[in-house]
Design a protein with these regions (language model features):
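Non-catalytic cap/lid and distal C-terminal segments of serine-dependent acyl enzymes
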Residues: 2-141
Length: 141
């Protein structure tokens, strides 16, 4: 899909300008694909990730990394998502920091107070995700 998008639309195709994101199981898929293709996806939005999926395979994937990648990662969770979601998101955050990602630098962890596991909650914080992953830059002129 990415070659098609880069061919058909005006993009900056390098990893520094390419992001991938998702929520829930989509968040896990974004993290999985991002870790597998770090030279393609330099920015990852991992919202309310279903860390429990496949017996925590994403935690094992992060822990098995031989080196930290040069990716910028947004990780978040709502405190009212239930089923241990917040605790699992913290486990993923901790696994990433153990591999070298630095909180508030190339990894941002956000707990949305009173937010549930739903589209409306993700929509309400999506602007924060985009501001972190794609910060404003000065235009020379």
């Amino acid at each position: 899909v990415k070659p098609f998008i880069d061919r058909e639309y005006r993009t900056i195709p390098d990893a520094a300008h390419t992001g991938l994101g998702g929520a829930s199981l989509g968040g896990i898929m974004a993290m999985h694909l991002g870790l597998r293709y770090p030279k393609t996806f330099g920015k990852l939005a991992v919202m309310s990730p279903s860390v429990w999926w496949d017996r925590g395979v994403i935690l094992r994937s992060v822990k098995s990394l031989t080196a930290k990648t040069a990716q910028r990662i947004w990780l978040d969770v709502g405190t009212e998502e239930g089923r241990g979601m917040a605790e699992n998101a913290k486990r993923l955050r901790d696994a990433l920091t153990e591999k070298g990602w630095a909180l508030d630098s190339d990894l941002y962890y956000f707990e949305d107070k009173r937010a549930g596991h739903e589209d409306s909650a993700w929509a309400m914080r999506s602007h924060k995700v985009l501001r972190f992953l794609f910060p404003a830059t000065k235009v020379r002129g």
